[in-house]
C-alpha cells in the first residue's frame, strides 16, 4: 500500500506543470492555506507552471478576485481555469441558440459579454446548469419535475 505523501517537494522535480484544485487545497472557503501557497510558489520559482483548476461556475477572473479576498498568493499560480471558463466557450459556440440558465443570479457572470439569448425552459435549445436557484432552501429533489421535462425534450 502506498504511503502518505506529506509534502509536494520530493515529487516536484518530476513535473513541469501542476494542475492544482482550489477548494480544500489552496483555501478552505474562509482563508488561504499558507503552506500550500508557499509550496506552489517554490515550485514556480524552480521553473514549474501552476494552473489552478476549479469547478466554480464563474470565469477565472472572478475566481481570482475571490482568491485575492481569501489571501491566496498571486505568485503561487500562473493561471486559473474554471468550469465557468469552459461554459463560456460552449455558450459562445452556441450563440445562435437559446439558453435556459438553471442557477442563482450570482452565477450570471458566466454570460457577461457574450451574445446570448435567454429563453424559458420550454423554448430553450439547451440548458446551462450552474447550481440551484436558491441553495439556502432548495435541494436537488426540488428540481425533479424540471429535470423530467428536460429529459423528455
Write out the residue ranges for each language-model feature.
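HAD-like aspartate-dependent phosphatase fold
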Residues: 1-153
